[in-house]
Amino acid sequence: MTTQLLDALTQIVLEFREERDWKQFHNPKDMALSLSLEAGEVMELMQWKNGPELEAHLTASKDRLGEELADVLGWVLLLAHDRGIDLADAFVKKIELNKKKYPVEKAKGSAKKYNEL
């Protein structure tokens, strides 16, 4: 994902918010809560389903899953923007940190947490 794409998506969600005069309600705490609630809706799509049933349900619910993931992304973009975070830069830096915490030679094929490797 390019920085230009992230910037364009951020502008879309900022315009949406501005047109509705909703910034007044968007403090960091409530934005984080909203992000979490939307992530909960992603999880709800998968709750109590496993294996082939989960795969079939996600295939049938692809549009809804996309909508819920888009809601999560919208809150991530707004929160990052409002807190002055360059999300592309933060993501690249975090991946570099994770590469150190999870070196391929220790982590490949393992679901263990970094402190258990």
List each language-model region with its residue ranges:
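Flexible "arm" and connector segments at domain edges
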Residues: M1-L117
